[in-house]
């Protein structure tokens, strides 16, 4: 259940009552269908299927009435005969709840708490204690400004800047904290920005005007050292810039902020203040290393993301410090778990420098219990009893490595976000969360039926940790809007944490608000040293072309590749993904197989999973392998189709995209749902025209018909025809392929690069650091509430997770 922000208007109830008066028989027939299914939860498609049945038997008026809007926006219905309660979501982030008594035909509006209490009765009525712990974070956020339009969700920093600049514009006294903020800047004992010669805003403005006049007479490239002494006498310290030109820009920005603040100027100025010198990135679970780890348990995309992230972040920090005229060396630490039984990886080394960086290291800290260090790997679902001690130990190790405290901490996934919360609370630093995936949304009804899952997954711990970390974070970044607030018809991952219940444990009536300005969309890119356009001939890895040709054309049928391509002059339609039901590779193969026009125009090559069922231990993958073999036989795909087993060499995969581009082919991402779509970004970065699912992140990455194409995997025939149309057009006009390829690249360069990501992240860290300071947003009340919840609930739940036992040596 995902239920959230309650819009307390009676409109939904009114619509139900109006329909009851106007179409009593049809509505009773519909509600009776729901009730006849017995106690349970109805999903949106169940709700609408029953409506279709009523419509086909004469309930036309019901379909045309106002009640249709209610049912179309219903996210679930709870059936407890004779009652049906419906959670209605008119738009992202806004919820209402109604309950209908089918026998009495009465309608009532429910509060979040009432709805959740009713839902709990599904669990055999065993949790009927009237005194259940309810968590409500809304009162703590009453003073925090927030937008109310769904389109504003995920643009938190823009909203915050508008709010801050308007306060400063209306009330000049609100500029005082900015003065204090600039005067309080120090790093390793060095004063930056302003010294104590400047005690008032008036003095600051006159000094800035004097500095502006002085700098305007100097060449723009004059080094700071040539006027540093004069500036210091006036009260200005290092940190304004490395040259007269850059310092003058900064002074103009601050003068504008002091005279007539606007959101853009404020953000630019705050983003340029030297605030971030040392960063900690927390990612405890899995085998975190740089080599021989991908494919090990709990070890995949998150590690690739973080390694690309920190390389870009270090480059940005070095560049900013140079521009700020500071000679400090930045440092980034990735704090993860040290695993003595490292399975041939480097995960048993305490410190490891990240390749391609100068100042970024993996710092590994072991999990400990009363028996000492835990030696073996444990699942991400079993880490909860170790995290508190891990955070304490990590704090000491971080202090030793940095010779002080970090300025900024980034948590990753549920465990990393909880540890980041503990560390940021202890150190008083700005915290950013990245979820990567929120497990609650992956397992339907894992909240209401949590006891079913708890022995294996310990979701009671994980959901509790998620709520604590979300509310403790200063800001949260996501890759897409849908991750926060879903779409018109689907609930966002964060949105599903706004209201839910774990019967017998606690009830969340207001957990997180998707309208909170802490949410920001900052999309990652692809590593441009690996993924770059096919046209950049000098950088191409031509030495790999022989092995790639074998991969695609070698006639031998083995466990690395099966199938063959008779006509190599045809373009290649390409896809690469895990072989599971959601990624829908077999769906793509079937759509291709059934479309004679597409088969005539292109060959199909897919990289996915194993082609031998004996090699897989995953039931879902085995089913997909069997389905793929069946499709090859049924549709006689030999000669037009090649199936290559999963490839983990990223450098070779990058060249494979470009190799496909050389054939004037295209990339397809056919998933039923894709949270972000990194392969879409990789393919577009290599210059491949891309067709990708409309369900999830790719719908935001691609502008349909401009930088690529959206396809709906639930309508495979339409998708296949769209792809065939593209290749027919390319056949008639080869320049069409080049145009789509170039527009795809343009889209990437505008929005989806690690450089854009790191610039944005550093700016956010500056703005939220300032916001925390000027509004005194230490959130003391919230933090006390969270502390109580952590100690009284999370710690007790963590004790229920069995401790791992190392095998005797």
Curated annotation (Swiss-Prot):
One of its GO terms (biological process) is sucrose metabolic process. Predominantly expressed in the leaf tissues and in caryopses. Gene3D superfamilies: 1.20.120.1230, 3.10.450.330, Glycogen Phosphorylase B. The keyword Transferase applies. It catalyses: an NDP-alpha-D-glucose + D-fructose = a ribonucleoside 5'-diphosphate + sucrose + H(+). Its EC number is 2.4.1.13. One of its GO terms (molecular function) is sucrose synthase activity. Residues 275-753 are annotated as: GT-B glycosyltransferase. Keywords: Glycosyltransferase, Transferase. Pfam families: Glycos_transf_1 (PF00534), GT-B_Sucrose_synth (PF00862), SUS_EPBD (PF24862), SUS_N (PF24861). It is an enzyme of class 2 (transferase). Sucrose-cleaving enzyme that provides UDP-glucose and fructose for various metabolic pathways. PANTHER family: PTHR45839, SUCROSE SYNTHASE 3. Belongs to the glycosyltransferase 1 family. Plant sucrose synthase subfamily. This is Sucrose synthase 4. The lineage of its organism: Eukaryota, Viridiplantae, Streptophyta, Embryophyta, Tracheophyta. The gene is SUS4.
